A protein has these predicted regions:
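Paired acidic/hydrophobic, glycine-rich loop segments that form the ligand-binding mouth/hinge
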Residues: 96-99, 257-262, 278
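Long, aromatic- and glycine/proline-rich binding clefts that accommodate carbohydrate-like moieties
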Residues: 328-362
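Conserved N-terminal structural module of periplasmic/extracytoplasmic solute-binding proteins
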Residues: 2-3, 7-10, 22-107, 164, ...
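Hinge/lid segment of periplasmic solute-binding proteins
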Residues: 100-149, 175, 278-280, 346-350
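Extracytoplasmic/periplasmic substrate-recognition and gating elements
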Residues: 61, 66, 71, 228-233, ...
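Glycine-centered hinge/linker elements that transmit conformational signals in sensory
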Residues: 178-179, 211-240
């Protein structure tokens, strides 16, 4: 028997009457075949530069491939990060996993908003673990540990026949070097009014900025020394002399011989500096060379309904393999000991003395 479904003998109307029911049936059948996404969704919030996010996203993609039952809903918050995290906690919509630093962690931990975490402590620098703990309990697994060093323009030192600084230099050496570097076009050293940048001058002399510390002899000496870099010796720019540029910009413009900053400056210097540069430790005071150590890492919200999956993600992010990936762009000092000693951090790129960052921690 021959089919007459759409034979030339049929009229168009008759043909359509026969085809449409078949098409509708096929649509209903195919619609019922669609697979519902049953994966557990983990919300993960983080700040970060483009280069950081370019490293992070493939890691999250790999995690999903290795854990097909989990889907990551990534929230990149590049600006006003903690303001937005505050609002999410206040509205009971906090992400499962939160990238956090040691400055804000106590606020959330003290409010009982974070889950206590455990980790193999031998894998990480104790300073990073301590920075992300509150009342003796760990609330975030560290990604990085940060500290301040002295960046210096090697070409400028060479032109002025100045010996490169070493980790053994003291405050007198530091001042003399800044004076030698200073001329009508260049200042010897940077000056910033944020406590992060002047606290080392106090701490290295046995002082600090807490009310119980500020009247100490070491605190007063450190503050006076720092202020006199501008006022007395004029080896650091006055506010009016640096109004049109940041300290980082002045260093890149070779208007500063030395620049006190952290590892976060390395990618920018690698890309933009048209001169040779390196790093050394902050100079020694009466109590040695002491700078503040900070850390960032991943925390889990106590309100998370998927703590097991969130823990799996945090452990994955903090693994040796991924810690090495985070180190590749030069932005961070890994909090994992093995990653910090790997070729991915000590990679031979500038600064030549990257190990200085580790010496300060160890």
């Amino acid at each position: 028997m021959k089919s007459e479904l759409c034979s030339p003998k049929n009229q168009l109307g008759n043909c359509l009457k026969k085809i449409i029911p078949i098409l509708l049936l096929l649509v209903l059948i195919c619609g019922g075949c669609a697979q519902k996404d049953t994966r557990t969704v983990i919300e993960f919030a983080s700040w970060g530069s483009k280069s950081e996010i370019d490293i992070l996203k493939p890691i999250l993609s790999d995690f999903e491939k290795e854990n097909p039952e989990i889907k990551i809903d990534f929230m990149h918050i590049p600006q006003n990060y903690f303001q937005k995290i505050h609002l999410l906690f206040a509205s009971n919509t906090a992400p499962d996993v939160i990238f956090i630093n040691n400055l804000y962690l106590p606020i959330y931990a003290n409010a009982n908003l974070l889950e206590e975490l455990t980790v193999n402590q031998n894998d990480f620098y104790p300073q990073a673990l301590e920075a992300l703990s509150w009342n003796g309990k760990l609330y975030a697994i560290p990604r990085d540990v940060s500290n301040l060093v002295v960046f210096y323009n090697k070409d400028l030192f060479d032109r002025k026949n100045i010996t490169y600084p070493t980790s053994e230099w003291n405050f007198d050496d530091f001042l003399k070097t800044a004076q030698k570097l200073t001329d009508k076009n260049t200042f010897g050293v940077s000056f910033e009014e944020d406590p992060l940048f002047y606290l080392p001058y106090l701490m290295s002399n046995g002082g600090g900025i807490l009310p119980s510390e500020i009247e100490k002899k070491g605190s007063q000496y450190g503050l006076n020394f720092y202020a006199n870099l501008r006022k007395k010796y004029h080896v650091a720019p006055l506010k009016s002399e640096s109004a049109s540029a940041t300290m980082a910009q002045m260093f890149l413009q070779q208007k500063l011989g030395m620049y006190i900053s952290g590892r976060w400056m390395v990618p920018k210097l690698r890309e933009e500096a048209n001169f040779d540069w390196d790093v050394t430790q902050f100079p020694k005071g009466t109590n040695g060379s002491i700078v503040q150590l900070d850390a960032s890492g991943w925390a889990i919200a106590k309100s998370s309904k998927h703590k097991e999956e969130a823990q799996k993600l945090v452990n994955y992010l903090a693994s040796s393999k991924n810690s090495e990936k985070f180190a590749t762009n030069g932005l961070i000092v890994p909090a994992r000991k093995d990653a910090s000693r790997s070729k991915y951090f000590l990679d031979g790129q500038k600064p030549v003395h990257s190990k200085i960052f580790l010496d300060i921690i160890e």
